[in-house]
């Protein structure tokens, strides 16, 4: 090989040895070489292994083939007009192979199921309950276990109650209306602080929460990561449904964040105007002329939901 001095003084020889060294590094120490060698070692093991048949979870059902979804509130949208509800149920059932049907409600699971059975509402593919703190999937009402782990971040219910229980105009609702991630009050607007003031008081105590007011009389406090809108977006992301293909229909303040952003949004005519006043000037939100389920049917037609599924242009075409 020669002494170091001879190698350094022989420029052509040095160049050759340098080239050989770089080639050796590429052949034996590069990531590509490592990967090739690794595969050579594990290939015999792989060849002897029986392949597993990958099957989708049972709860996914036909949703695997859905490319769009419709979410609606329960009380404000589906109850109140039996004739329109019967037509809507028929339409949803006829299109179930291509579109997910979801209900998002402030009710607890047991209460929502009871009302759905009473009014003949078909079983949804997805049921978001307790204001967006629980997600269940048909056909066995399987609970999404990842959602509670996500929303428990910075949740301190005892501290929240210490702040709110002492305020005038707030009365804690019965235990049946409370849940792990939802604290519910009756609110008397004549005596209670405004929503902004309540949020300010909680913020001063370093409590990060979501506060929802519904129908001017129900106040729900949830973890900062929980709401109907957050739960809807979590579902859409997990099941790979574009928000642009999600129709969200609501009518109260608790539904507002479902209808913001890129969803196809619809507000039924029997809405709570004061709570949804900030949505009036938003382009992507359709304000239906009909109430309850009739307003949802109107929105399905407006967005051509089962065909083009898009926001109409200024001239009314899609």
Where are the regions a protein language model picked out?
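Two-component system phosphotransfer/interaction surface
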Residues: 1-9, 35-43, 297-304
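Conserved acidic, metal-coordinating active-site core of Asp-based
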Residues: 159-261
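C-terminal alpha-helical cap of glycosyltransferases
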Residues: 6, 31-60
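Mg2+-dependent phosphoryl-transfer enzymes with acidic/Ser/Thr/Gly-rich catalytic loops
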Residues: 85, 222, 229-318
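Active-site phosphate-binding/coordination module
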Residues: 86-175, 270
